[in-house]
Amino acid sequence: RTNGVILGINPEFTKYNFRMYPNEYHISGFAAYASIPKVYHIGLYGKFNNIIRSLPLTFSFFKTKLLLTNYYGYGNLTNYDKELDENEFYKTNQEVNKISLGFEKEITDKITITFNAEYRKLETNIYNTLIASDIPNNKYGLGNFKSLSGELGVTSDFRDSKTFPSTGTYFFLFYKVYPKFYENMNLYQKLKIDGRVYFNPEFLNKSILALRFGGEKNFGTYPFFDACYLGGKENLRAYVLERFSGDAYLFFQSDLRLPISNIKIIVNGKLGILAFAETGKVFTDIPDKKWHPSFGSGIWFSAIKNTFNIVYNIGFSNELITHYVQTKFGF
């Protein structure tokens, strides 16, 4: 199950100063509503270059019920029933309030280091006792929960375009630690990686082959909503969002994108087709050899020097046929 149609607004304000690059500060707000879970997501983000020279400070706040809308159980071997899903059998009711402060440091124009300190307040309920009984560590994380955390991220981006990459590489490494704090009774940690490569294969003129791998690992005893989740448009497109949860995950994706014609749809642009194949799995303390393949195809339109994209994907797995319409490529 997806979140359906998500409608929202994203106002932005930027103040420029010729002594500061690229600006003095930038503030953006957003508000969104998801049609299927019928929940909201609101937030505010700011980046300030005028407080500490050469060290931009960041601030964010959001309040949402959209982070975890369903819980399908722990591990690779859980059963899924589409009809039960449509009748809200797996539904969770979670509200998250989060505030963070941090900074960004550009080592070069291609490599950035970020640090954030974060406070969260959550309330999570699952009214289906059959689903709640599958939560590991004695349902750890249900009810009210507060946490503090510190995170460090390193991004290396050598792509030729952020919106329509055709060559180059992208790599992201992320570490986060949660110390003991109120309901968080255990120190736990999270490590995450995301690597991508783009090139133009000789066997198909003007095509783009995009390859991606991702992994995540938790260390220590963590609340169930901070498990490593796999499924949905971000990794396994032919499965519902956050279909599988575990102590770790690993996934691989491949996209072949082929332009087929120049076309005008209000503005001049390129029309193309794509095909994808991917697989992934989660890892728990009970070993298994189950992987979850997903494949599909789609059509895309790109315009305004590849900064405006509309992408349609249809995905197939042994559980579902999924459809996505987005304003960006999967990765």
Residue ranges and their predicted role:
Residues G269-L274, F329-F331:
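Flexible, glycine-rich linker and terminal segments associated
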Residues G43, L57, Y72, E83-F89, ...:
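C-terminal outer-membrane beta-barrel translocator/porin domains of Gram-negative envelope proteins
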Residues I27-Y33, G46, L57-G75, F115-K121, ...:
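Transmembrane beta-barrel strands of outer-membrane/channel proteins
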Residues N10-E12, Y45-K47, G102, G153-T155, ...:
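Outer-membrane beta-barrel architecture
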Residues K15-N17, S35, N50-I52, K105-D109, ...:
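Outer-membrane beta-barrel strand-turn architecture
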Residues T284-W291:
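Small/polar, glycine/serine/threonine/aspartate-rich low-complexity segments that form flexible
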Residues T14-F18, F30-I36, T64-L68, L122-T124, ...:
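Sequence/structural signature of outer-membrane beta-barrel proteins
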Residues R1-S147, E151, L230, R243-S245, ...:
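Gram-negative/organellar outer-membrane beta-barrel architecture
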